[in-house]
A protein has these predicted regions:
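Beta-strand-enriched, solvent-exposed domains that form extended recognition/catalytic surfaces
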Residues: 28-63, 67-74
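A domain-level signal for caspase-like cysteine endopeptidase catalytic cores
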Residues: 35-36, 41-44, 52-55, 103-216, ...
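Cysteine protease catalytic core and zymogen-processing segment of caspase-like enzymes
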Residues: 196-285
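Active-site-proximal C-terminal subdomain of hydrolase catalytic domains
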Residues: 256-340
Length: 340
């Protein structure tokens, strides 16, 4: 056992020393991030457990001279002229996994909680617009991420309740679309999300690949940031929006229902507060990570209850939904008696 420990320690130390020496020549944010992710994959392929591999990755970035924040499997790294959030979920979830929150090098912060409160009853208020928009930015990933049956079911239920429905997928879900097309009575987003510990904010991925030369005003204000997701062992970076984007582009929403089928959409109320402050009636989301399959089945049941069975938001949530394996719970903020 001692011999194996020495081999393991030597392997990790060797990787770190070699990597830091190579980075010292020409430090670049993207290069440092990719090098770390490459080692993360290598550690996991060698049989190192996910949580331990995350720990090694955090130490790698700290040793590389970056500021590192951690919230479960969401790692925020800042340095060498850039910032990235790494959504290092395990297979089959909408990105985040794990529930601790740690900042390396500074005192840890304590994010706020999420969830609706107050009494619950039948619907007594509704969106003032009979339009709905459905967003599916990661349909291209295939497997469980490709689920046209879900969108057909939700579209049918919404149309039965009198809503006109538009649908956007993959690269159609741009930051420009998010800035201009979400003024609807219902907004449903099915995609990757996470938590940026450096700002204590929920973040939601678009379907648009990252570029330093686009949306520069949004970047400079922190309204969009760079987040990375894993697909088949490769990592891809996307424009990802923060609560600030919603607060700065919307102010008169039509008492909307915002439904986030994304990991950690209600880890705290930061994203919900932005939507509600912009005029939304209620915001539904998951407190932790959620498996794609369970998130899909819950969303399909919720929209059937809201549109066909006449339930309110709080009545849906009170049925009690907890994601297998992750413990994520469906919650809401805002007006629980909002109906569709």
């Amino acid at each position: 056992v001692k011999k194996m420990r020495k081999i393991y320690t030597g392997m990790v130390t060797g990787i770190l020393v070699f990597s830091i020496v190579s980075l010292a020549a020409a430090p670049d944010h993207t290069h440092v991030v990719k090098e770390g992710l490459s080692h993360f994959n290598a550690w996991k392929s060698q049989g190192i457990e996910h949580g331990k591999a995350l720990g090694l990755l955090k130490q790698y970035y700290v040793t590389a001279g970056m500021q590192v924040y951690s919230a479960g499997s969401d790692i925020t790294v800042i340095g060498y002229g850039g910032k990235s959030v790494l959504l290092l979920h395990e297979s089959g979830t909408w990105s985040a996994s794990g529930f601790d929150s740690t900042l390396f090098g500074k005192p840890p912060g304590t994010p706020g909680g999420g969830g609706g409160g107050g009494g619950c009853g039948s619907p007594d208020t509704w969106p003032t617009s009979s339009s709905a928009i459905l967003l599916d930015p990661f349909e291209w990933q295939g497997g469980v991420f490709h689920n046209p049956q879900l969108f057909n079911a939700i579209k049918s239920d919404l149309q039965s309740a009198g809503y006109s429905v538009s649908y956007y997928k993959n690269t159609q879900v741009t930051i420009s679309l998010i800035e201009t097309k979400l003024d609807k009575g219902v907004v449903f987003n099915r995609g990757h999300g996470g938590y940026d510990s450096s700002t204590r904010s929920v973040i939601i991925c678009s379907g648009e690949r990252w570029s330093e030369n686009k949306y520069t005003t949004e970047q400079n204000n922190g309204w969009v940031i760079r987040a990375w997701i894993d697909h088949g062992g490769e990592y891809y970076d996307f424009f990802t929006y923060t609560p600030g984007l919603i607060s700065n582009y919307y102010s008169d929403l039509p008492n909307s229902l915002i439904y986030m089928e994304s990991c950690e959409g209600l880890r705290n109320s930061s994203m919900a507060d932005a939507w509600l402050g912009a005029g939304a009636g209620a915001y539904m989301g998951w407190s932790k990570s959620v498996t794609v399959v369970y998130g899909d089945s819950t969303a399909e049941e919720n929209f059937n209850d809201l549109c066909i069975n006449g339930l309110s938001v709080c009545e849906c949530v009170e049925k009690g939904y907890t994601s297998p394996y992750t413990g994520g719970k469906l919650k809401y903020e805002g007006t629980g008696t909002l109906g569709l």
